[in-house]
């Protein structure tokens, strides 16, 4: 179904994509036209310029609907647009086409493409494909897949490549019980270059490992004074408690 020059056809077809299954969606009945309208007005919406389907997720056809597998939540997209056009739209979201080109390729027009892609982005199905390639060595495929899938949960990075760049540039200090510090650093390698040391100004994160015999409260207070974000990890008996994450930039207290 091609979009007409007024955009009304694209709005109607894109709106049909958003008929989500109330049992599976956090926003039942959300329509692409509504999401697209919000995306044009809210700067928190960063709709991909050249969308690509996220790694580790799959849109599966089920009769007249499409089911999202691998996302942070189960979703079902239905309606006439989903039945007739969503397959072609997903194929066009390969990271090489702009929204205008996707609209032309699929016949839904630029407005319909914007609305439909806005919905797919809100649902964690697509991310930004217009990003600079990563330098060698490349991240492990498993890490790339994880970063892509988690991107929708955090909403911080436009693409998994952006997340990988931030991860590679991170300065992480791990402090606390010496034996546990060594084990954690070994587990993080080679995903993250962490060091066994007290936090220093400019660090991205300090992981503070506390035990019954070594509570590490003093190091947490030191991080707070330096303005370094910290993640508390408490190990006692047979339990491990991760959190809270404390950022002096917005956390009210330790």
Q: Where do the PLM segments sit?
A:
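A generic structural signal for ordered alpha-helices
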Residues: 35-37, 64-67, 71, 80-81, ...
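Short acidic low-complexity segments
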Residues: 193-203
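Long, charge-rich, low-complexity alpha-helical segments
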Residues: 2-28, 72-194, 232, 239-241, ...
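A generic structural signal for short, non-catalytic loop/turn and secondary-structure boundary residues
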Residues: 52, 61, 167, 246-249
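Short, charge-rich amphipathic segments
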Residues: 38-56, 119-120, 218-234
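Long, low-complexity, charged/polar intrinsically disordered regions in eukaryotic proteins
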Residues: 2-7, 12-74
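E1/E1-like adenylate-forming module used to activate ubiquitin-like modifiers
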Residues: 2, 201-254
